[in-house]
Amino acid sequence: MYQLQFINLVYDTTKLTHLEQTNINLFIGNWSNHQLQKSICIRHGDDTSHNQYHILFIDTAHQRIKFSSIDNEEIIYILDYDDTQHILMQTSSKQGIGTSRPIVYERLV
């Protein structure tokens, strides 16, 4: 059975450059890792009070974003854009103690 995680990125588009918005949009969509039976749904919006995450850092040069849950800021998530079909996701603690191995996700069509 697949584990499904929803990620609702909450941010103010008026405070971002066009390049930063484009970088975020690379990650919007549905992604899956069939081997680990994990899926994630990444979207923009605060239309729900659940699974809300705020963006901490946008690295447009490396197509990477860092974000954390509004409810638990101790865990930091890092998304790296690999290509149009793949992203990498890893977690780290706010104190910088340890980082998980990246998990590769494939875009679901």
Curated annotation (Swiss-Prot):
Which UniProt keywords are present, listed alphabetically?
Answer: Cytoplasm, Protease inhibitor, Thiol protease inhibitor, Virulence
Q: Where found, per UniProt?
A: Cytoplasm
UniProt xrefs under InterPro entries: Protease_inh_b-brl_dom, Staphostatin_A/B, Staphostatin_B
Look up keyword Cytoplasm and say if it applies. Answer: yes
SUPFAM superfamilies in the cross-refs: beta-Barrel protease inhibitors
Described purpose of this protein according to its UniProt entry = Specifically inhibits the cysteine protease staphopain B (SspB) by blocking the active site of the enzyme. Probably required to protect cytoplasmic proteins from being degraded by prematurely activated/folded prostaphopain B. Also involved in growth capacity, viability and bacterial morphology.
What is the name of this protein?
Staphostatin B
